[in-house]
Amino acid sequence: MHFAFLGTSGSIPTAVRDTTSIVVVVPDGALLIDCGGSPVQKLRRAGVDPQALVSVVITHIYPDHSYGLPALVRNLAVLGRQAPLTIYCRPEHVEPLRSLLSLFSTLERPGMFALTIRAIDLAEDVHAFDLGPLSVRTSPNEHSAMPNFAVRVDVARRRNVVYSSDTRPCDAVVALARGADTLVHDATYSERDRNRPAGHAHSTAAEAGEVAARAAVGGGPGVPATAAGRTAPARRTPHPRS
């Protein structure tokens, strides 16, 4: 298993970083988690064949995590894809995603590959689905008024990565990330923002490191700097609620 960052920015892309998304690759295929703009281009830049995608996870439906989905589906269809594709999301996001794809006439087209949008279980640390040797588990996290969830990908309990995008520090993510090799965690704010209003449901880079340390990411909590180094880069955005 290996994974690649397709984007690490907040809700506003920078000149060199797009919105948050990662791809996890195994011999059986690839799993895309969140879908920003130009996903096919970014997959190719990462050395991943877009046709290798088997599943897509959309953690929540703020635009920076989902707006690239119609482009992805349309591009795959134009490329001649025949294999089915499954999109996983929260139950309340199934219909909004169907509406988004329908708006661009990409939900169903004559001769198009089979596309399924499937709801995940909302319980903490629950098995969601498998992809070859990958076992995917999820837990709700805490992101203001927008329901969201974190994702853990394990390869036969040998190697793993945990991804939690927009969230404040929370126990559910600590539990999901327990003993993980790598934690990719929201790090929107700098330390000077630690006393931000409670409604700004993101984390500082230091808080992301504290979550990693509490979860003993990378082998133990004794070296917080190492744990912090396993989180996503700090990213500033003028729209902290997205």
Role assignments for model-derived ranges:
Residues 168-242:
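Cap/insert and terminal regions of metallo-dependent hydrolase folds
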Residues 1-163, 168, 173-175, 234-242:
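Binuclear metal-dependent hydrolase catalytic cores
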